[in-house]
């Protein structure tokens, strides 16, 4: 099998303060057919400045994979249901092995 061919996919991450919030967001995205998959990992230790104060929080990261057609819809859905006042939203264009990339790109309804 030739694994040299690639397909473009989008990968985004956000973080939540609990595994329950991460599960809720992931399930909403999957059930809405907006993403092919979500992976939750954690706990992570996040350090940042928020409203002038240095903050140390335990968080869980959600990594989402989906097609470029759903880019705006995925971001809007996450920002709509996320419990944070200012959720992290980082989206990256990536290349995946062709068969996996095709699965990602064809899993979601448009």
Regions found by a protein language model. Give the residues of each.
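Positively charged, small/polar-rich N-terminal and surface patches that mediate targeting and assembly
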Residues: 1-110
